[in-house]
Design a protein with these regions (language model features):
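Membrane-water interface regions at transmembrane-helix termini and the short interhelical loops
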Residues: 6-13, 38-53, 72-91, 142-150, ...
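Helix-loop-helix connectors at the membrane interface of multi-pass transporters/channels
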Residues: 2-15, 176-192, 218-242, 273-279, ...
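Membrane-interface loop-to-helix entry segments
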Residues: 54-57, 64, 199, 203-207, ...
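Flexible loop linkers connecting adjacent transmembrane helices
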Residues: 2-11, 44-50, 77-96, 121-145, ...
Length: 526
């Protein structure tokens, strides 16, 4: 077949999975319309659903949060760790720096910037573990808890679906980026059955819910940075304008594809992030930042199990439901998307390399940024240089972040850099989301090909419309509720993926139960 024919075949409409695409996109558009037309009703029902889920299943979310680390550790250090996603002599498709950069910028986004500065202030106002607000202990724990919420657990949750999907792509050489194909051991044989279609639709809606949450946090952040930098008015019109700019940016990147779009944005963003972190460390209270970070390492290691399983059953103060369970739900909602994206860029790496790379480099990146950003805002609050808690109570999270950054030397320069960083961070996240959503809605997609461009652009527009609907519905709690609700059906799907992976490993490598680990590159015989 000629190159031209292959190209035409790659983008022909017949490859679109019409049932998954149209049902999913229609659902997203209808929900967006309902949130826009009936914002108060949408907010009430979303928060009721979140309260019911966290009340009845909060304990379950906390237990689920422990499983990814255990399972990923077994994969990395067990007999299957040296299995390679590719042939024996195949090199990684992307350099380690680009690979880590794409994973980090696609997964954490500018939410890390927003929460890095704001989350500690929430915790000194409403501390965990029965601690007195604004006490010395509250300040110490306010620096530790963000590291816990953004550390090993979320990256392990992202890693969990990555391995079965990469195995499916590069060992079985399945021409698909559908989650349903990685759950085949528990699904009917017929791929066009209702079960396969429903599973992919649930995944799409879960991904959209997780991404919409990030947009709900990110748009006000970028707007506040622009207000501080340019002096424009902070209102709904400005927020919608930011969404439109964003949609154009990541829609263009999604149109360009993986290597020309996402990789370029990720490379730029990693460089900018290191610049911001170095500037905070050098221009900020260096000794204080080093001391509080060292202190937090000890607190974290000494209390990790307590934080992981703390349900607050006696006092019932609501901290686990409002924070830990919310975060675990957020990461779960994002997990299928991140698993698909991480797997797609992990060709040529071993299972052990992928697991350690995702959890190790990812956790290190969030640890460094949260230690510096959180330490800096706590320094300002604790030394009466900025009443961050008052700004949080009266104006909200986004204006607080802008004001904290404005306290650094050369505020105009650093505000400009952080604004650009935030824009690209989110553009990379939603670019990846549009790419993955389009892939799920595509039939028979080989690992070396990309989904139809207009399919990708359609999802970029869909995400932008959902963001506008969520902004009109308004409210921090509404955004959080969206995450928790969308995450619940994803949990059994991830369990199905893990079961299928173990089934594949036992079937394809029976010799590993008797002999020392070997490297297997060839697809198993059918």
């Amino acid at each position: 077949m000629s190159a031209q024919a292959q190209t035409l075949d790659t983008i022909r409409p017949a490859r679109l999975d019409k049932r998954v695409f149209y049902i999913s996109l229609a659902t997203v558009l209808i929900l967006s319309l309902l949130m826009t037309v009936f914002p108060e009703i949408a907010s009430v029902y979303a928060q009721r659903a979140m309260k019911w889920i966290t009340h009845h299943f909060g304990w379950f979310y906390l237990l689920v949060g422990t499983l990814p680390l255990i399972f990923c550790g077994w994969l990395a250090f067990g007999r299957y760790g040296q299995i390679k996603f590719g042939t024996l002599d195949e090199k990684p498709e992307y350099s380690t720096i680009s690979w880590v950069g794409m994973m980090f910028t696609a997964s954490m986004g500018a939410s890390l910037i927003a929460w890095g500065f704001a989350e500690p202030i929430y915790y000194i106002e409403t501390p965990p573990l029965g601690i007195l607000a604004h006490s010395t202990e509250a300040f110490e724990w306010a620096h530790v808890y963000p590291i816990f919420h953004w550390g090993f657990t979320p990256w392990a949750m992202y890693c969990l679906p990555t391995i079965p999907i990469a195995y499916m792509l590069f060992i079985h050489k399945t021409a698909s980026l559908k989650i349903s194909d990685s759950c085949e051991a528990l699904l009917p044989d017929k791929k066009d059955s209702v079960a396969w279609t429903l599973l992919d639709i649930f995944v799409v809606l879960g991904v959209v819910g997780g991404v919409a949450t990030s947009l709900g946090f990110g748009v006000p952040l970028v707007t506040s940075l622009a207000v501080k930098l340019l002096g424009v008015e902070d209102n709904l019109t400005t927020n919608i304008f930011v969404v439109l700019i964003w949609t154009m940016l990541f829609g263009t990147s999604a149109y360009l594809g993986l290597k020309r779009g996402i990789k370029l944005l990720a490379d730029i963003n990693i460089g900018l992030m290191f610049v911001v972190m170095a500037f905070i460390l050098i221009a900020g209270p260096t000794l204080y930042l080093l001391n509080i970070t060292t202190n937090s390492i000890g607190l974290f290691l000494n209390n990790m199990l307590r934080m992981t399983f703390w349900t607050d059953p006696i006092e019932k103060g609501g901290f686990p439901e409002a924070w830990t369970i919310f975060y675990w739900a957020w990461w779960i909602a994002y997990a299928p998307m991140m698993g698909l994206f991480f797997a797609r860029i992990s060709r040529g790496r071993t299972i052990k390399n992928v697991v350690l790379g995702i959890i190790g480099f990812g956790s290190l990146g969030t640890f460094l940024f949260l230690s510096l950003a959180g330490g800096y805002v706590l320094y300002l609050q604790g030394n009466d240089l900025l009443d961050a808690a008052y700004i949080m109570r009266t104006q909200g999270m986004a204006p607080l972040v802008a004001e904290v950054i404005n306290q650094l030397p050369f505020p105009t320069v650093i505000l400009t850099v952080v604004t650009i960083l935030s824009l690209i961070f989110y553009a990379t996240t939603f670019d990846s989301a549009a790419y993955i959503l389009a892939s799920i809605c595509t039939k028979d997609l080989p690992s070396h090909e990309e989904p139809n461009r207009m399919n990708r652009v359609a999802w970029a527009l869909g995400l932008g419309i959902m963001a506008i609907g969520l902004m009109v519905a308004g409210g921090f709690e509404t955004v959080k509720a969206m995450t928790v609700v969308s995450s619940l059906p994803i949990i059994p799907i991830i369990f199905m993926m893990c079961f299928t992976l173990v089934t594949w490993l036992q079937r394809d490598f029976p010799q590993l139960s008797r002999l020392p680990p070997i490297i297997r590159q060839d697809p198993p015989a059918n």
